[in-house]
From Swiss-Prot:
This is Elongation factor G. GO terms for molecular function: GTP binding; GTPase activity; guanosine tetraphosphate binding; translation elongation factor activity. One of its GO terms (biological process) is ribosome disassembly. Residues 8-290 form the tr-type G domain. HAMAP family: EF_G_EF_2_B. Disulfide bonds: none annotated. Catalyzes the GTP-dependent ribosomal translocation step during translation elongation. During this step, the ribosome changes from the pre-translocational (PRE) to the post-translocational (POST) state as the newly formed A-site-bound peptidyl-tRNA and P-site-bound deacylated tRNA move to the P and E sites, respectively. Catalyzes the coordinated movement of the two tRNA molecules, the mRNA and conformational changes in the ribosome. It comes from Albidiferax ferrireducens (strain ATCC BAA-621 / DSM 15236 / T118) (Rhodoferax ferrireducens). It comes from the Bacteria.
Amino acid sequence: MARHTPIERYRNIGISAHIDAGKTTTTERILFYTGINHKIGEVHDGAATMDWMEQEQERGITITSAATTCFWKGMENNFAEHRINIIDTPGHVDFTIEVERSMRVLDGACMVYCAVGGVQPQSETVWRQANKYKVPRLAFVNKMDRTGANFFKVVDQMKLRLKASPVPMVIPIGAEENFTGVVDLLKMKAIIWDEASQGMLFDYREIPAELLELAKEWREKMVEAAAEASEELMNKYLEEGDLTEDEIKFGIRTRTIASEIQPMYCGSAFKNKGVQRMLDAVVEFMPSPVDIPPVKGMDEDENPVVRQANDTEKFSALAFKLMTDPFVGQLTFVRVYSGVLQKGDSVYNPIRGKKERIGRIVQMHANNRQEVSEIVAGDIAACVGLKDVTTGETLCDPGAIIMLERMVFPEPVITQAVEPKTKVDQEKMGIALQRLAQEDPSFRVKTDEESGQTLIAGMGELHLEIIVDRMKREFGVEANVGKPQVAYRETIRKTVEDAEGKFVRQSGGKGQYGHVVLKIEPNEPGKGIQFIDAIKGGVVPREFIPAVEKGINEAVTSGVLAGYPVVDVKVTLHFGSYHDVDSNENAFKMAAIFGFKEGCRKAGPVILEPMMAVEVETPEDYAGNVMGDLSSRRGMVQGMEDMVGGGKAIKAEVPLSEMFGYSTTLRSMSQGRATYTMEFKHYTEAPRNVSEAIMAARAK
C-alpha cells in the first residue's frame, strides 16, 4: 500500500499551553477547520462524515487527546494537502513528565499563551523541556477578545522570561471587544474573518490607516529576522532594503527549524479568529520528519546506529504513551521513526528482550477512530495487543535491533497511604492502581511491609489527588488517603574497605554458610546502586555471585538510619569464603545483607531530603512577607524578578517537608492574590536537627 501523503508533507506538532490559555478550544478549532476542508471519506473508502456536536456530547474528545490526525490545504486552499498529527500536552507542572514524553516525539510545538495572563511559570517549564529536546516552536497569543488583552506585552514577556526570540508575523487589529482580525505582515493586508461562517470565510482588506506605521515597523523586524538566515539574503536585504515573500518565508522557516526564532501569531480561538493563519504557519514554518536530524540509537552491542526517516529503512518506533480504552483495552501510542509496520507484524522490544505481535493499528482522525493496515515513517498511531511495553521503550524490527534513547523519569518525591472505602473494593483498587502506574511512569505503587498499607507515590500533592480521582471516575473505586509523607532517601559519605558479612548456621545436618567481604563507597549523585564483582581465584564460587547481588538489592530498600531506601552507593565484592557442603544461595544472600548493613553503619550514613524549586508570583506589597516566610521554611531565596504586568516573581529552593499546606498560608498572606508553582529539583543532605527528628519519628 503506497503512502497517501509524502513524508515531506507531514507535520508532527504538539499544542502546549498554560492551564487557562485556551488550549482545548484552540485544538477543537483546528479539528473543526481541518475537518470541514477535508472529508475523510474522500481519501479512504466509505464516506466518513464528521458530526462535530455528537463528539462533544460523548466523552470522545478525551480519547483524541493523545494524538489526532488532521489534514490542511491552507486557509485559501493554496497548499498541497498536508497531514498534521497533533499531540496533546498537559499544562500542569505536576505532569511535566507528560510534557516531557510528548516533547520527545514531536517535530515542532505550538505554544499557546493567554493575551491577558501572558507567560506564566508553567510556560517556562514547558519551554525548558522544548529547549532540552531542541523542538522548533511557534507562538499563538490566544484570547485577544478578553478584557486586558495585550499582544505586545506577551512579546516582551517571551523575551524577558523565556529568553526567546519571538518574531510577530501578524499584529492584531483592535483588542478586547474591538478585536476584529489581524494584519498579515507578509502580505501587508488586513485579514477580517466572517462571523457568520464561524471564521471559515475571510476577506483581505487594506490595513486600517491608524495601524499602517506600526505594521511597517513590525514588518521591518520580521524581514530583518528572515535576512539573518543566510549571507545571501542578508546582502540582498542590505542592498535593496526588502525581500520577496518567498525569501522571507525561506528565511523564517530556516531559522525556526534551527530553533533560533519563533514566529508569532494571535487570535481568539473562541471567536474563530486567527487559528487558520496559525495552521498555515504550521505548514510553512514547522519541520517535516526529514527536516530534522535522523533519530539515533544503539544496536545490541551498544554501537551507535542512525535511522533515516524513510519507508525503506528497517522499522523503528518509540512508545510514548499508554492508555486504557473501555472498548479495545490497552492502547500503546507510538511514533514511527523509520520503516513500515503492518498489522500482524512482530516487533522486538530491546529493553525487555521480548518479541510481541501487533494485533490492530488505530489512528484518530478528529473524532473518528480508524483502523489502518499499516503505518509508515513519520506516522503516529495507537497499537492494540502489546502486553509488555511501557512508556519510553523502543519497538523495532526483530532482525535489525536499535534501542532509541530512553526517556528518564524522575523518582517520586511524595507518598501517601491509600485504602478503599469498602473492603469489597480492595481487589478492584489493586487493579486500578496497577493500570494507572503502567500509564504514568512517574507514579509508583508499593506495599508497606510493616503495616501492610498500600502506598502511592508521585510528583506532588496534585498528582496524587488526580490519581485518586481517576480511580473513582474510571474504575469506580472510592478511596481514603492518608497524610502526604515525604520520600526521604539515605546514602553514605565515607568509604569502608572491608565490610564483612557472615551467615553461619551449623548445628548438625545440612547447615548454612555464607561469607562475603565488601568495599562500600559513595557513588555519584543520580548513579544509583552499582554492584561490582571483583572476586579472584574463586573464593566465592561463580554460582553464588547473583545471590550476593540479590542480597544487596534487598538491603538497599531499607537504610540503617530510618529505614528509607539507600541511593548512590557503589558496592564491590572482593573477598569471602565458602563451605563445600553448607554453602547455598540463601546463605550468601543473607551474608550480603549483613555485610552491607554493617558497612553502611561505618560509612557515615546521612538522610537526604527532596528540595523543590518554588516560584511565587505576588503583588509587590506582599513580596517581603513572602520572602520572609520562605526563609522560615528553610528556603533559600535565589532571586526576585519584576514581572511585565507589575508584581514580583520570587524564585527559591525549599525542602518539600516544609511546603505542606503552603497554598493556604500564601492565600491568607496575600489576600488570595499570590500564586505559586513547585517542582522537584534534587535531593540534598538534611541538616542534623531535621535528620534527628526524622529518625525519632520513624522509631515510634
